[in-house]
């Protein structure tokens, strides 16, 4: 527990219908008394009161006030929420009036959540799930964040930790009494648990980073020769003029990026410079960046002009076999297009469209969503959402693979202890100040 009472605006700053302010700590009720006068406040009940500046008695606003008693609050401390009108002036006056009280200060970013963690209201994975929920922009990101915030990863890692503690207790018992012979049944059970955990952690790590990709966004790059309709496709996807569309080859010279929600998945679309032979050094640099963006993307859309399909250049031809590539044949309104397997591979989705006439685009969207599901949908299994989880799990796995119960039990016990610690690093059972500071600094103020 920390003695200092903290305060912050939890809602977004600026003009709004309602603003929410949060106070956490032992002085919460005293501050309410200073603002509203003394009254019998019952936990979890809403009160409508006039709030005034304590020093001048000037009316600040009429507000709703809710009190949450320590064990039933978000932070595990006494918490008061004040709901005012969303006026900038009200926010300034209320903040100034509250901070005039001794023993209270403005909260640091993430400090409310940090207190919730320190008071045992949530573990670190749940706290980070809360961050992901706040930052989620699509349905699938929201779904993953809710699962983590409700303790899906915490339950899994705590279960693994419990199994390792069980084995460690077996081993330490025989280390303390070396004259006792370990029964074969105990050895078999311990080996079985270690083998099962090794397999489960390996499978968990072999998730092709779906949780991390979903959290950060799926990168989709659009490339192709000049004037195939790449910028027109970007404009269609964004439903605005995000890129200049022109008949002049080489109009797009740099990578243009847009963040979209497609089928509930966060898609980062990158329109790239058209690929062709050019003597212009600026355009050459744009083409170079296009190929890098294409290579580093998760989903690739290769645009081909239906009126010029027989003259696909070699650079483009090499891109046809990339994983998760969708081949889009554009301008089918200008020619009677027919698929030719001698020109295009048959193992990739080939979508014939007319961006001008808005033909074939529903199927293109379906293909994008289909690839997004393969890349970033973890299904019903818990997903690793952060690199720090992955690093700790890899280290725990390496230690489990070293455990040999047939030889040195002291060494085996130490390997198990270290594996347990790495699992505890993830959930925060072992509190490392540097890790805590980094995690909670990423929160917004007021959370």
UniProtKB/Swiss-Prot annotation:
Keywords: Cytoplasm, GTP-binding, Hydrolase, Magnesium, Metal-binding, Nucleotide-binding, Potassium, tRNA processing. GTP binds at residues 227-232, 246-252, 271-274. Pfam families: MMR_HSR1, MnmE_helical, TrmE_N. The keyword Transcription regulation does not apply. Residues 217-373 form the TrmE-type G domain. K(+) binds at residues 227, 246, 248, 251. It is an enzyme of class 3 (hydrolase). Binds 1 potassium ion per subunit. Its EC number is 3.6.-.-. Mg(2+) binds at residues 231, 252. It is found in: Cytoplasm. HAMAP family: GTPase_MnmE. Exhibits a very high intrinsic GTPase hydrolysis rate. Involved in the addition of a carboxymethylaminomethyl (cmnm) group at the wobble position (U34) of certain tRNAs, forming tRNA-cmnm(5)s(2)U34. Belongs to the TRAFAC class TrmE-Era-EngA-EngB-Septin-like GTPase superfamily. TrmE GTPase family. This is tRNA modification GTPase MnmE. The lineage of its organism: Bacteria, Pseudomonadati, Pseudomonadota, Alphaproteobacteria, Rickettsiales.
